[in-house]
Amino acid sequence: MVLGIGMSRRRWALSASVALVAILVAGGAQAQSLSDSVRMTVQTNPKIVSQENNRSEVDSELRRARSLYLPQVDMRASLGPEYTENIFTPPGSNGQHIRQELSAVLTQKLYDGGATTAEVDHQLGRARSAAYRVAENAQYVGLDAVEAHLDVVRLRDVLALADKNVQAHADLVQRVQARSNGGAGTAASLNQALARYEAAQAERDQVRGDLADAEARYLTIVGQAPGTLEDPGVPAGQLPTDLDASIHIMRTNNPVVKAREADIDTAKAAVELADSRFDPKINLEVGGDHNHNVGGVPGRDNEARALVVLQWNLYAGGSDIHNREAAYAQVEQARTERLEALRKSEQDLRQAWAAYEAAEHRVPLLTSAAQHDSEVRTAYSDQYQLSQRSLLDLLDSQNDFFQAEINAENAKSQAVFQAYKILAIQGTLLQALNVPPPPQADPSTPTPRPIRPEGT
């Protein structure tokens, strides 16, 4: 068993040497910053790209609605045999002719009760809502990237601590073996040390598994495997002075709330569209016909016209009334959803602030506790050598020190994450990281016309 420990120590030393060489080789390469991780996520994450495509689709609907202001031109042509027998059929004719028709009509809306304007406003509201949903996904998927980045950094640090913990237990096994060989130790003490050593190895394996999961999640969110990652600190300069200031920023910038406000405008436009159904429709029609052999009459039959046409539905079974009632209900629903989104965002923001302040308070305490545990471990090691402390005391002090280091590391990472979560809920995460939002997140900027997909 002692030989096995010695081999383990040599393997650990070899691994440490390889890791050191890798660090030195990679030293010239710049660590990937948190901003880089979020920027790649915003550019490539499928959730965000899906919302960008939705914005493009809605913008196409907006262009379609605006085209309703323009005139419509229709042409019709026909050619074929016709048999006609009526009072206009010339004597001696068999009533068979080759009928030819050609007509063209230009129709321009003069009045439609505001239906076209309401449809444009409806699609404008949808476009604004779609833009804010792009911004929403960019903020919160960006926050997922922050969490994935921090988790990889944290677990790599924890793995380094676990390696040190395994080595410390290996050293203890060697010391107990040496005492046992000198007649000062027992087989029970050696077994106790070996059990703790193996438990430390198992804990390190667990950390390795957690790190592999974190790296896989990073790959899924960011779109590439994590290399050397920068360990970011708390963005203290980007945070508001207090919770009230943060809530004020959230009410102004949170994209979830702004999307719901756009939904209210969309629903109001639907009410105007429903109201327009009660008004007449007035169109200007300019057209002409160039025909031959129509209605059994041989020869030309030409016609030109310019008409003002009024069309008014006087009764539709009450469907227009029901449409208007449904539109009013949609407005109230949109207002309720906006209030719900605002309350939920404020709740999330308050919880994030509480978690951030708690983590910030815990970091110095846990760091100090780890330092004290380190001093206790050193003192117990000296006392154990003088037989003034038991092996159990020494093993427990090593475990306490290891757990204290992990607790301090976790608290530091949690404080950083909660700070960025505050920024995301405010709607200012990308701005704080100097990451440009997707162009589709700007409601004032129309998206370009989509390219025809391949295979269509």
Language-model segments: residues:
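Amphipathic alpha-helical coiled-coil segments
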Residues: 50-65, 137, 141-161, 171, ...
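Boundary at the C-terminal end of the N-terminal hydrophobic targeting segment
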Residues: 29-33
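Small/polar (Gly/Ser/Thr/Ala-rich) solvent-exposed segments
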Residues: 49, 72-96, 107-138, 258, ...
